[in-house]
UniProtKB/Swiss-Prot annotation:
A GO CC term attached to the entry: cytosol
Cofactor note: Binds 1 Mg(2+) ion per subunit.
Protein name: Succinate--CoA ligase [ADP-forming] subunit beta
Cofactor: Mg(2+)
One GO term of the biological process aspect: tricarboxylic acid cycle
PROSITE patterns: ATP_GRASP, SUCCINYL_COA_LIG_3
A GO MF label: succinate-CoA ligase (GDP-forming) activity
Family of this protein: Belongs to the succinate/malate CoA ligase beta subunit family.
Organism: Pseudomonas putida (strain GB-1)
Alphabetically ordered keywords of this record: ATP-binding, Ligase, Magnesium, Metal-binding, Nucleotide-binding, Tricarboxylic acid cycle
Subunit description: Heterotetramer of two alpha and two beta subunits.
Length: 388
């Protein structure tokens, strides 16, 4: 689950980290009032969406009057912001963050992720702040320095100081960086985060360090023990199809291709998408119906897949382990009849009662193409999507 910038900064402040004074507002009038509360003569106004690239899309602006802040809020509230990280429809703007202006002398990067290879939290820092860390990692990987956190003792101040020295910080900045580093590590662990970024972490004109941005992603599997963070969820930022799928315990991620995929098991789903790509097709989605697939869930899965108007064919790839293939076949037939599927459907069944499942499909009288292997399934669905 992603948090908005203002929510991330709220957590930063609770851990004693330096952030700008600001207020999240949902009306133009409140934006003007926020300027009065903050004081000063310059403010930064930011549209709050779960996507990067807001500045280039016009979603971040420096304003020098309350009227300009009010006008910015009126311009964006209730509208959709399109950035390079969103689709063509963009993300809805329901909040504007109004905060004090910061004089920036230098921009740095500081972030943390769970590294699966070492099975530990790894912090990354760089002098290349304000740009995508993925771009830095690709073009100049030597500019990224790392610190691995021992899960038994946690982040240590000396690790923060080592990173600070490698970043070229000096004097009071070293102690400030170490404090930010330890605070972020504590926040990461205590709130079950999957990703945390401060980009940029800036050196102000007076030499002090300051967290100018906050990007936080929480591990969805740990949300049951984070009741406070559950209240931070903004459903307006969710893909409606993904939200609908989650209500039926279906794991769905929308993509940009034209071949719908319905698979049981996340690993098999990834492999299915790979082989579709290998044979020249483009998956329209990732959809894992799970090990306990039922007729109802298969029906909902079809509805969700076909809600994407780009889908020209559907590939159903099921491995019968706990679940029987003949039961899945009956579910597919029932779903095709109920939903009124008008695109070609290719089905590959393997495992428990696979032969019986194939027989059930063959005797259904429906336009369902039975595949003999995963390769055959991929080739058939690509042809079907192309109208061949």
């Amino acid at each position: 689950m992603n948090l908005h910038e203002y929510q991330g900064k709220q957590l930063f402040a609770e851990y004693g980290l330096p952030v700008s004074k600001g207020f999240a507002v949902d009306t133009p009038e409140a934006a003007a009032e926020a300027c009065d509360k903050i004081g000063g003569s310059e403010w930064v106004v930011k549209a709050q969406v779960h996507a990067g690239g807001r500045g280039k899309a016009g979603g971040v602006k420096l304003v020098r009057s309350k009227e300009d802040a009010k006008a910015f809020a009126a311009q964006w509230l209730g509208k959709r912001l399109v950035t390079y990280q969103t689709d063509a429809n963009g993300q809805p703007v329901t909040k504007i963050l109004v905060e004090s202006c910061t004089d920036i002398a230098k921009e740095l990067y500081l972030g943390a992720v769970v590294d699966r290879s070492s099975r530990r939290i790894v912090f990354m820092a760089s002098t290349e702040g304000g740009v995508d860390i993925e771009k830095v990692a690709h073009e100049t990987p030597e500019k990224i320095i790392k610190a691995t956190i021992d899960p038994l003792v946690g982040a240590q101040p000396f690790q923060g100081r080592e990173l600070a020295f490698q970043l070229g910080l000096e004097g009071k900045q070293v102690a400030q960086f170490a404090k930010i580093f330890v605070g972020l590590a504590k926040l990461f662990k205590e709130h079950d985060l999957a990703l945390l970024e401060v980009n940029p972490l800036v050196i102000k004109a007076d030499g002090d360090l300051h967290c100018l941005d906050a990007k936080i992603n929480i591990d969805a599997n740990a949300m049951y023990r984070q009741p406070k963070l559950k209240t931070f969820h903004d459903p307006s930022q969710d893909d409606p199809r993904e939200a609908h799928a989650a209500s039926f315990e279906l794991n769905y991620v929308a993509l940009e291709g034209n071949i719908g995929c319905m698979v049981n098991g996340a690993g098999l789903a990834m492999g299915t998408m790979d082989i579709v790509n290998l044979h020249g097709g483009k998956p329209a989605n990732f959809l894992d119906v799970g090990g306990g697939a039922t007729k109802e869930r298969v029906t909902e899965a079809f509805k969700i897949i076909l809600s994407d108007s780009n889908v020209a064919a559907v590939l159903v790839n099921i491995f019968g382990g706990i679940v029987r293939c003949d039961m899945i076949a009956e579910g597919i037939i029932g779903a095709v009849k109920e939903v009124g599927v008008k695109v070609p459907v290719v089905v590959r069944l393997e495992g428990n009662n696979a032969e019986l499942g194939a027989k059930v499909l063959a005797e259904s009288g429906l336009n369902i193409i039975a595949a003999t292997s995963l390769t055959d399934a991929a080739q058939q669905v690509v042809k079907a999507a192309e109208g061949k």
